[in-house]
Amino acid sequence: MANISSPFGQNEWLVEAMYRKFRDDPSSVDPSWHEFLVDYSPEPTSQPAAEPTRVTSPLVAERAAAAAPQAPPKPADTAAAGNGVVAALAAKTAVPPPAEGDEVAVLRGAAAAVVKNMSASLEVPTATSVRAVPAKLLIDNRIVINNQLKRTRGGKISFTHLLGYALVQAVKKFPNMNRHYTEVDGKPTAVTPAHTNLGLAIDLQGKDGKRSLVVAGIKRCETMRFAQFVTAYEDIVRRARDGKLTTEDFAGVTISLTNPGTIGTVHSVPRLMPGQGAIIGVGAMEYPAEFQGASEERIAELGIGKLITLTSTYDHRIIQGAESGDFLRTIHELLLSDGFWDEVFRELSIPYLPVRWSTDNPDSIVDKNARVMNLIAAYRNRGHLMADTDPLRLDKARFRSHPDLEVLTHGLTLWDLDRVFKVDGFAGAQYKKLRDVLGLLRDAYCRHIGVEYAHILDPEQKEWLEQRVETKHVKPTVAQQKYILSKLNAAEAFETFLQTKYVGQKRFSLEGAESVIPMMDAAIDQCAEHGLDEVVIGMPHRGRLNVLANIVGKPYSQIFTEFEGNLNPSQAHGSGDVKYHLGATGLYLQMFGDNDIQVSLTANPSHLEAVDPVLEGLVRAKQDLLDHGSIDSDGQRAFSVVPLMLHGDAAFAGQGVVAETLNLANLPGYRVGGTIHIIVNNQIGFTTAPEYSRSSEYCTDVAKMIGAPIFHVNGDDPEACVWVARLAVDFRQRFKKDVVIDMLCYRRRGHNEGDDPSMTNPYMYDVVDTKRGARKSYTEALIGRGDISMKEAEDALRDYQGQLERVFNEVRELEKHGVQPSESVESDQMIPAGLATAVDKSLLARIGDAFLALPNGFTAHPRVQPVLEKRREMAYEGKIDWAFGELLALGSLVAEGKLVRLSGQDSRRGTFSQRHSVLIDRHTGEEFTPLQLLATNSDGSPTGGKFLVYDSPLSEYAAVGFEYGYTVGNPDAVVLWEAQFGDFVNGAQSIIDEFISSGEAKWGQLSNVVLLLPHGHEGQGPDHTSARIERFLQLWAEGSMTIAMPSTPSNYFHLLRRHALDGIQRPLIVFTPKSMLRHKAAVSEIKDFTEIKFRSVLEEPTYEDGIGDRNKVSRILLTSGKLYYELAARKAKDNRNDLAIVRLEQLAPLPRRRLRETLDRYENVKEFFWVQEEPANQGAWPRFGLELPELLPDKLAGIKRISRRAMSAPSSGSSKVHAVEQQEILDEAFG
């Protein structure tokens, strides 16, 4: 009989075989067995082993048998053994001798163990319970699981994994099934083990080809979650096949699982070995026998599912039939229960709800066709809510689901999965199985990419997206996968080096979001594939250095020089900026194509999203400059320069300039043919979680306002990131619209490298700290899916290490530069001497004529017609007002070949109905732009100039940023932005502070943008009075911009022309008039346009003409702007010859030489006053009060101020109070 006291049970043969090998050669046995085998004593056999014997002749056998003495047969012993087994059954039965030619062999090893074990099993009185369990839910959920694993990490879950785990859970409810019988001191005893150790029968093939069966145990199963159980299961099987099992693996099995169903057996009653209380058998999954001849369609129609037969063979001495039956019933219920499958899915990180068990719905197939179509529509509208896009999965208990996406919500069940329904062209078919429909829908909308396009109103765009998204994605080739991996290698290598070399330095690392590098690379590559000219990138500081190195191609040496604190020697002047704000330019070459494309990264400040409108303006300027093939095959502009804009999630949702910039997307004056937006969504804003930083479901919801498609993509899936990037470019090219990619990722470190994010986000960073990076995860996924081999992965790793080494080598060769104080940029650009801004009278006349050169049949508005006639009159006779003086400047520049762009709120007509640059037909609405006629010479040839004038949206931040960007993209253009009232320019203060006033000093980025800011105290209240002169003067330094407040149309004319023609790229700020627009004295004569140039300091005309006597003047009033006309009127009224008024037309840089020359003409002056309308703490005085005495200490050391009192608001809200204050200023000035 078997040695039932052995802890190895049916594995005893293997132990004995190992012992014999160990005895002959200890080195032939795994060292883990040595300690056990030294003390092992095998059970002695009852007979010596014999070699196989071939019987040569029946006759010899008969004679041998006859010669042997024969004992009479004993009567059979019918006494029952103590365990109820009839002893006679154990007696050897006489067997006829083998026939001639038969091969006779004594059974050894596993075969002998089977004999011994089976004989031993006869001592266990067993009974068997049988239960048929529906297998459909098991089959369907396993399909879902394995499809997800195939897409991600690879591997499979077997039916045995699931059944074994259900068995273990059932044992928890019925612990008696885990007991076994023994005798202690001759007394029958039931033993309840402390743990459930599940025995698995593993079929092994030896080197000689013979197969053997071992039973290894998974220990302490009741303590495991499903993922742990699967890991332990796979470990046992792997070590068994590798011959690495230890003594511990064989000992202590308490309950066994056998699966003869794998060979087609439907029902099995296995033998139960001593030492166990039960063995569970699993039969084959089959349809009921009576349906096995039915077609698949008929089976689906009837709702027939496969069954699996479970048997429980148990020791009847300690387990009763009711317990065994309930045990099987519990397994049955588990395999159909929601809770069991929820746990399995969570443990395997399957982000979707499992298929649910339900009864079949008897509704008609016609009704269900409609339900299937509703389900398809639901996935197209809501599928993104179920997409597996979060690489952190912080809420692991939450499934990605939505009621609209559940088949049960639509009156469908798992029984409908294999039924065929009408799908009306979905995925190119008229009829499909629901299973296939669901598979396609989930693949399209619910995997690592979530697509939002239901908000798009254009059916063509929606259909295009559906066709592209619902088509099976073409898997990248091995070469493409290796290329993606190489980009991840480069991204991670760069960050790893910086982290080790420059510990603690701020660099705003890309770690956790490395997939943005292959994503950007793919987008640029696709742009090159389309034959476009350039990609211009705008982005914040997060990951900027990585983009500079691995996308734009900025040399590592330059980047590391900046890390060392050295400015680029080519930018010796200026204050410079931190390394993660700088721009660069490079050339991108396709890896798998023959095209190339220019790539540039524009400089940015730390003000998040401020660069957005700047980028759009820069791109529009480049497009206008190229102007080649301006109409594509679809009759649209060929927008061959592509803006690629990166954002952070918190900033995209939180910064208002994002909405302002998006609003520009489809406007005629601002359209760039679509921007590719990539949101690096690390799911945190500094320390703020999304639930505190936005009210919307997604950070991208603001983009729905312009009908942009939105793609949410898992940053841990670089292949999905690459696919989405290419699709985004294709959509942009097809429809000339914005596209938004929301790449969900995480931030490996804090907001900067010195910050500890776990202080405020501990749970998130517990997850992040243990998470593999995208490069490692992708490598493992490629190997797990079988896409690349281990060798190829090792080659990629060597490439990664090689790139690290290359970085180190470049750093070693860096030359250190000595740090010097920064120098001013003021002297870098000087006004050329003798610059002429006057024009010929004939050009003035031509511009005047243009306003009456209306197209045939054009009817001007009756209130506009007199204005046009007056302009023609002024062009010939003089008395030119402010508005026409401005148009003369712009028109003359167009005639000289300049591109002139004017924009602003209501700028075509003018806020004060003064400009009328675009005329509207009173009856047809047709538009006519007179100054555009100046783009053609009198002989019909083009001048090369253009006049572009646009009414802007009601925006300052984005509008000013756009115009600034336009000047960066086209330095030769004359670009003007006009505020509706100067007060509102503070809506663009970030652009003024970060770009206009300091861009040259920080980045060497030049701009000649013009801001026209209506300014003046006229009693219209504090919000329609001041353009905040004091703020611009405070920002001025190093010649960073020109600030002017001209008081005559001709001086304004020359100021604009000087700015356009002097070759200096610096902004111009002009404080323009309001009431002075129609002031009768504020006019200029023709000679003022044809004979002189801009004058930064103006005297009164009486002194300039030699009429006034300067020697009588004892007081000088210095002033600017329209206040001059009020002072001049009061002087004339009071007949004050002792007082002169001098106008500073240019406020910065202060015209020191001109001012001195002017003041020196007045030899008897004793008092100097600065007179302004603005309060004492506003206007020019806060700067002039300090600067004028330093500028001319011999004259202006004692200069005094005349103004309103210091005020917190620019003016009073009462027009009557305004009039009183204005009178007080005049009275004091003439007191």
From Swiss-Prot:
Biochemical pathway: Carbohydrate metabolism; tricarboxylic acid cycle; succinate from 2-oxoglutarate (transferase route): step 1/2; Carbohydrate metabolism; tricarboxylic acid cycle; succinyl-CoA from 2-oxoglutarate (dehydrogenase route): step 1/1
Keywords: Acyltransferase, Allosteric enzyme, Coiled coil, Decarboxylase, Lyase, Magnesium, Metal-binding, Multifunctional enzyme, Oxidoreductase, Thiamine pyrophosphate, Transferase, Tricarboxylic acid cycle
Superkingdom of source: Bacteria
Record comment: activity regulation: Alpha-ketoglutarate dehydrogenase and decarboxylase activities are inhibited by unphosphorylated GarA, and allosterically activated by acetyl-CoA, the main substrate of the TCA cycle.
Record-linked InterPro entries: 2-oxoacid_DH_actylTfrase, 2-oxogl_dehyd_N, 2oxoglutarate_DH_E1, CAT-like_dom_sf, DH_E1, KGD_C_sf, ODO-1/KGD_C, THDP-binding
Residue positions binding thiamine diphosphate: 542, 606, 608, 649-651, 682
Coiled coil: 787-817
Chain positions recorded as acetyl-CoA binding sites: 1042, 1058, 1093, 1096, 1146, 1153-1154
Protein known as: Multifunctional 2-oxoglutarate metabolism enzyme
Native source organism of the sequence: Mycobacterium bovis (strain ATCC BAA-935 / AF2122/97)
